């Protein structure tokens, strides 16, 4: 996923279907400098991770 699209998803009031390794996730924050995003699985909000944007897929 590119940085611009990830930022659009974060700012959107609508929930978008995004996955990381096949797991549905929520994007909390996009770091443009490092090309990463802070995410968590929808069913485990306490499990935050910092991942590369190119590993995220929009369904």
Curated annotation (Swiss-Prot):
Zinc-finger among keywords: no
Source organism, top-level taxon: Bacteria
InterPro entries linked to this entry: SASP_SspH
GO cellular component annotations of the record: endospore-forming forespore
Keyword Aminoacyl-tRNA synthetase: no
Entries under Pfam families matching the protein: SspH (PF08141)
GO BP terms in the entry: asexual sporulation; sporulation resulting in formation of a cellular spore
Main location: other
UniProt subcellular location: Spore core
Gene induction: Expressed only in the forespore compartment of sporulating cells. Disappears after 45 minutes of spore germination. Expression is sigma G-dependent.
Keywords for this protein: Sporulation
Similarity-based family: Belongs to the SspH family.
Name by which UniProt lists this protein: Small, acid-soluble spore protein H
High-level lineage: Bacteria, Bacillati, Bacillota, Bacilli, Bacillales
Gene: sspH
């Amino acid at each position: 996923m590119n940085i611009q699209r990830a930022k659009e998803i974060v700012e959107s009031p609508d929930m978008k279907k995004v996955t990381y390794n096949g797991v549905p996730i929520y994007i909390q924050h996009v770091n443009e400098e490092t090309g990463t995003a802070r995410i968590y699985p929808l069913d485990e909000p306490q499990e935050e991770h910092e991942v590369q944007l190119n590993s995220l897929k929009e369904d």
